[in-house]
A protein has these predicted regions:
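Radical SAM enzyme core and accessory elements
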Residues: 1-54, 374, 395-447
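N-terminal [4Fe-4S]-dependent radical SAM core
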Residues: 3-28, 52-92, 136
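Short, acidic, Ser/Thr-enriched surface-loop or helix-capping motifs
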Residues: 21, 350-351
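Conserved alpha-helical substructure of the radical SAM core
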Residues: 73-193, 198-202
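Short glycine-enriched, charge-decorated loop/helix-capping segments at active-site entrances
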Residues: 109-113, 217-225, 419
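Radical SAM enzyme [4Fe-4S]-AdoMet core and its adjacent flexible, acidic
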Residues: 213, 217-232, 236-343, 353
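C-terminal accessory region of radical SAM enzymes
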Residues: 300-335, 361-410
Length: 447
């Protein structure tokens, strides 16, 4: 037997926490047990006779494993199995790349007047048929409307697609969900009535750019110059209709103090309504320290301002939880078992013009296109798409082999590696940052 390479131990006030990032198991150790584990690290088999109960707990939790276990290969296989999950499909549709707001941080190129054509709508509906036909193990079908501002084309695109989606999936043993990422300004009662009639679990993501005038100045619109209060009211209206809402708050070092003030807007909601809020604070990428490559990380330091901003975000997360809200930081710590929805093999993003993409966090242009939607509803993917998804992370990100977070990080994002084309680390190669991530994982684990 041997100790797992993915064991992490750290002290706390009353003792030590032992956590394994592969099995996601944790143990509380007093000082005596922590010392015993350290002393017997290289001869762990001897511990079975000295302290059999402790040894059994270590084996049961995956802290001690058989000598022939290749843990790195096990993580690679776990990641591949997650991405190849045949029981779910994630289909994203961009009805338009036009938008009724002008946000300074937006990475997309607005295409004024763009709209999915009737023929592309028909091809998209045929794609839904194709997905249902070719995926006999399908148990969860997730449909997303993105953009641009998708509600600009509610009648022209969303209604016919969603109506067809509802009709084609009704009566099947499939969990169906719809999520609409919107700026929220165009929501009205007629739309909400339509979504309820579809009989499909529907959720919204609505974004704020600060509190009050900070939001209004950042989110420019001639039609909606005072959009902050409009969005607050629309979120509350959705909650009253028993619809879940992801309240995403984009913040910078200048307005991080707004986070809690925005949450306070929902204190007057009833407890059941607050339970339907998923709070997601996101630091705007132009404001954050985004260095992830080794070369870049060697040339930066995390300054005091960054630490203060992070602390304010963490404080707001705790406050949201105290109000009974759900909390979902934008970067899932465990992206192996819970990958980005666009990383799955069974995932596609259909642009208004029929171009097909994987990642929705990059511009929808020719350089990033991964395929084309054909008229019969099938997708003609680039030949190397699956080889890039399934490529072993340790083949090109060699630092992952020695990293305690590999079982939860999985070597990072395919798109990010494509952007940098060199070794990188989501935690900036910083061991303290990695340990903090472990502590967050432990906080999510029942001790």
């Amino acid at each position: 037997m041997k100790t797992s390479r993915y064991n992490v131990i750290y002290s706390q006030e009353s003792g030590y926490i032992l956590y394994n990032t592969y099995t996601c198991q944790s143990l509380y150790l007093n000082s005596e047990l922590a010392d015993i584990l350290s002393d017997y690290d290289t001869c762990i088999d001897d511990l079975s006779s000295l302290h059999p109960n402790f040894f059994k707990a270590l084996v049961d939790g995956g802290f001690v494993i058989h000598n022939n276990v290749d843990e790195i290969e096990a993580v690679e296989q776990l990641r591949i199995d997650s991405l190849a999950d045949p029981s779910q499909y994630h289909l994203t549709i961009n009805p338009t790349l036009d938008c009724n707001f002008h946000c300074w941080y937006c990475y997309e190129s607005k295409v004024k007047g763009s709209e999915m054509s009737p023929s592309t709508i028909e091809s998209t509906i045929s794609l839904i048929d194709d997905i249902l036909c070719k995926n006999p193990q399908l148990k969860r079908f997730h449909l997303y409307f993105f953009g641009g501002e998708p509600l600009l084309k509610f009648n022209e695109v969303i209604k016919p697609v969603l109506k067809a989606f509802s009709e084609k999936t009704t009566g099947r043993d499939i969990l169906r969900t719809v999520q609409i990422t919107t700026n929220g300004a165009l929501l009205n009662d007629a739309m909400l009535s339509f979504f309820k009639k579809c009989g499909i679990f529907t959720a919204f993501q609505i974004t704020f750019d600060g509190y009050g005038d900070n939001h209004n100045k950042s989110r420019f619109s001639k039609i909606h110059p005072k959009s902050y209060q409009l969005l607050i009211n629309n979120v509350k209206k959705l909650l009253e209709k028993e619809i879940f809402v992801t309240v995403r708050v984009n913040y910078t070092h200048k307005n991080a103090e707004d986070l809690i003030r925005i949450l306070d807007e929902f204190k007057d909601c009833c407890e059941e309504d607050r339970k339907r809020i998923i709070y997601t604070p996101v630091r705007i990428w132009q404001d954050a320290t985004n260095a992830v490559t080794k070369k870049a990380c060697d040339n930066i330091s995390i300054n005091e301002s960054d630490c203060i901003v992070t602390a304010k975000s963490n404080e707001s997360i705790k406050y949201a939880a105290s109000l009974g809200m759900n909390v979902m930081p934008i970067n899932s710590i465990d992206s192996v078992r819970n990958p980005c929805k666009h990383s799955y093999v069974n995932a596609a993003s259909i642009n208004y013009n029929g171009d097909v993409f994987k990642c929705c966090a990059r511009a929808f242009n020719d350089d990033n296109r991964e395929g084309i939607l054909k008229t019969d509803g099938t997708i003609e993917w680039k030949a190397d798409i699956n080889s890039r998804i399934f490529r072993k992370r340790t083949d090109f990100n060699h630092v992952c082999k020695e990293c305690i977070l590999f079982p939860v990080c999985g070597g990072g994002c395919v798109q990010t590696f494509k952007d940098f084309n060199e070794e990188y680390c989501l935690y900036r190669f910083d061991e303290k940052s990695k340990l903090e991530a472990v502590k967050r994982l432990v906080s999510l684990t029942k001790m």
